[in-house]
């Protein structure tokens, strides 16, 4: 998914201009702008600032959007690795039609603690906040009471 490219494409469309005109006005090739809009290239800081200036956007908005997208993609990829490992360990034998999308974060964390090794467990801290992991650990894993 390329949200930043789609957003820039929408800005261009809503401005009533063509990609070639916008590219010319900000001093880049039409091909480079097209690569950014289609997600084939990332924005450089310099180019993000030029596009933000052209469309009167706050400084850093596009670059921040791109960074957030990169972080989300990274987290999704890490979660996919853990989910695949959990399936290989048959952690979901009692679940019906389980998928990465319909598994709660709490169940995901709990099963990771139960079925996977320390290297895999450490990946949880790249996906979720420490306090949330600790809460799930206390509520679902640690034996309470007698």
Q: What residue ranges belong to the model's regions?
A:
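Mid-protein regulatory/catalytic core that forms ligand/cofactor-binding pockets
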Residues: 89, 101-146
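Residue-level signal for the short linker/turn that defines the boundary of a DNA-recognition helix
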Residues: 16-18, 46
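Recognition helix of helix-turn-helix/homeodomain-like DNA-binding domains
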Residues: 28-43
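DNA major-groove recognition helix of helix-turn-helix/homeodomain DNA-binding modules
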Residues: 46-61
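Short, charged recognition helix plus adjacent turn
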Residues: 63-92
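A short, Lys/Arg-rich alpha-helix, primarily the initiator
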Residues: 1-16
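Short alpha-helical "recognition helix" segments of helix-turn-helix
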Residues: 19-24, 33, 51
